[in-house]
Amino acid sequence: MSARMVIVTGLSGAGRNSVLRALEDIGYEAVDNPPLRIVETLVRGDKPLAVGVDARTRDFSAEDVLSTIDRLQTRGCVRPELIFITASPEALQRRFSETRRRHPLALAGTVSEGIETEQALTRTLRNAADWVIDTSELSLAGLRQIIDQRFGLGGPGMSITLVSFGYPSGLPQEADLVLDTRFLRNPHYIPDLRDRTGLDPQVRDYIRQDPDFPEFFERVSGLTDYLLPRFVREGKKYVMIAFGCTGGKHRSVSLVEMLGSRLRNADWNVLIEHRSLGSRSVGGAWKAMPGAHQGAPMPGVQK
């Protein structure tokens, strides 16, 4: 067997799309919701493949998904791993409420009815899964860490996640290092900057003018220059550095952006996550963070 393949399924709102994006970021070719009858044709060469299927997939049935996996194994070219993404009904209902989206299986019913219907449709897949990942109390960065640890290809090296957050929301539990930026001048008190964020160059320029900023940023840069190569030497595959401020919008975001730019210029593999803004950046491309739960600890992963 030469190719590696994972099939990602689960409950709507649990984070299946986030898992597919995480797999794509670490080198997989990701295909979402192809008709089941063509899945076997997608396996070619040594390129690792991630296929997303759910109740919206054409011709979907749990039995057909398992039959497809059996046929791929019989061919001998690949042994697909089945990942099932789940979350508690309370977490799913909260996410659908926050995004104001209708559950795809709710039809004229309620979100809770849609969740119950999908749980019944996918129960066989959950029972057959190689991995069950519960995202109820899992942050996006924590989910990405699990995916990288379990399904990483060993190519890109250590992954660095830089996180900005607001202290009222709590510290990121998965962080290896937390830095407090609240001693820096606060753009919140400048009327022209209050409604902007650290993604805005004007906000970053204002923070750079703080007399304490140059030495602080130099010391942070020196610390990362010292630590990161040693983390790599230790065999660490993932590290998270978090910056906090009062609201999680100005100072922490600015520091994450500036350090992220510096590390990317040094060819480090960097993911940026702004928890209070609900966004993330991979290689400089911004994406929304649907359903990301802030400041939550990582749960266990069932195998």
Curated annotation (Swiss-Prot):
<keyword id="KW-0342">GTP-binding</keyword>
<dbReference type="GO" id="GO:0005525">
    <property type="term" value="F:GTP binding"/>
</dbReference>
<dbReference type="GO" id="GO:0005524">
    <property type="term" value="F:ATP binding"/>
</dbReference>
<keyword id="KW-0067">ATP-binding</keyword>
<dbReference type="InterPro" id="IPR053931">
    <property type="entry name" value="RapZ_C"/>
</dbReference>
<dbReference type="Pfam" id="PF03668">
    <property type="entry name" value="RapZ-like_N"/>
</dbReference>
<protein>
    <recommendedName>
        <fullName>Nucleotide-binding protein Acry_0446</fullName>
    </recommendedName>
</protein>
<feature type="binding site">
    <location>
        <begin position="10"/>
        <end position="17"/>
    </location>
    <ligand>
        <name>ATP</name>
    </ligand>
</feature>
<keyword id="KW-0547">Nucleotide-binding</keyword>
<dbReference type="Pfam" id="PF22740">
    <property type="entry name" value="PapZ_C"/>
</dbReference>
<dbReference type="InterPro" id="IPR027417">
    <property type="entry name" value="P-loop_NTPase"/>
</dbReference>
<dbReference type="InterPro" id="IPR005337">
    <property type="entry name" value="RapZ-like"/>
</dbReference>
<dbReference type="InterPro" id="IPR053930">
    <property type="entry name" value="RapZ-like_N"/>
</dbReference>
<comment type="similarity">
    <text>Belongs to the RapZ-like family.</text>
</comment>
<comment type="function">
    <text>Displays ATPase and GTPase activities.</text>
</comment>
<feature type="binding site">
    <location>
        <begin position="54"/>
        <end position="57"/>
    </location>
    <ligand>
        <name>GTP</name>
    </ligand>
</feature>
